Amino acid sequence: MRCILWGANGAMGKLIDSILKDEIVGRVSIDGENGVPRTAGELGRVEADVVIDFSHHTAVSGVLEYAEEIRATAVIGTTGHTPEEKAMIQAASQRIPVFYSGNMSLGIAVLCRLAKQAAAAFPQADIEIVEVHHTRKVDAPSGTAHMIFDAIRQVRPQAVEHCGRAGEGKRTAEEIGISSLRLGNVVGIHEVHIDAGSQRLTLRHEAVTRDMLAEGGVEAARFVAGKPAGLYNMQDMLG
């Protein structure tokens, strides 16, 4: 598998580089350090099977354009995309295979599936999501917490996302609360609490190191390479 890596000098890029090694045939990084091209123009045309993006969500337009130009698969590992950027991803998937996930962890994909199954099994249960991350994380709730909510909403279309809790007012039956904690150097913890009255269920995933995201990104690249045009995600990889 021949890969081009966007965001090669970033933390995730370096991890992926260490896994794929000789399979990397091209690199791009906005900082230009270590002689790495800063743009697609500086890189030039390089034949590859997959373009893996772990740079920044604002780069997605250039990543997709380059992947289409060389007729390669695109794996988008960045988060925080605007509605316009998500529309670009959707449009590109009509022409090339695109793998896009808000979290590249296979364990999180399993958690989302289990949360969906639990919500279906206990249609009247109260459900709350709790996410914990390090103090340097700038967004809340996490994109992964939104992913979990979206998975639950597939079987509870009436569900309403409620971020945080303050002031007066009872919890409504439709809401699914999301609580965010920022503590020390926590890589990432996500919990789903289901209260069915006579019984309670807690689903929990903890990221021990960020290696899981790099490993998931590589697995995603191998999974989607050679697939027909379309939009793929971690649930597709689970089968």
Where are these regions (language model features)?
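Short glycine-/small-residue-rich Rossmann-like dinucleotide-binding loops
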Residues: 55-56, 79, 180-182
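Rossmann-fold NAD(P)-binding glycine/threonine-rich loop
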Residues: 63-65, 77-99, 109, 113-117
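N-terminal Rossmann-like NAD(P) cofactor-binding module of classical short-chain dehydrogenase/reductase
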Residues: 51-52
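Generic hydrophobic/aromatic pocket-lining and core-packing "Φ" positions
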Residues: 17, 60-64
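C-terminal substrate-binding/catalytic lobe of Rossmann-fold NAD(P)-dependent oxidoreductases
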Residues: 2, 6-45, 123-239
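Short glycine/serine/threonine/alanine-rich loop segments
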Residues: 22, 72, 96
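Structural detector of well-ordered beta-strand residues that form the stable sheet scaffold
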Residues: 4, 73-75, 99
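Short, acidic/turn-prone active-site loops that include or flank metal/cofactor-
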Residues: 30-33, 79-82, 103-104
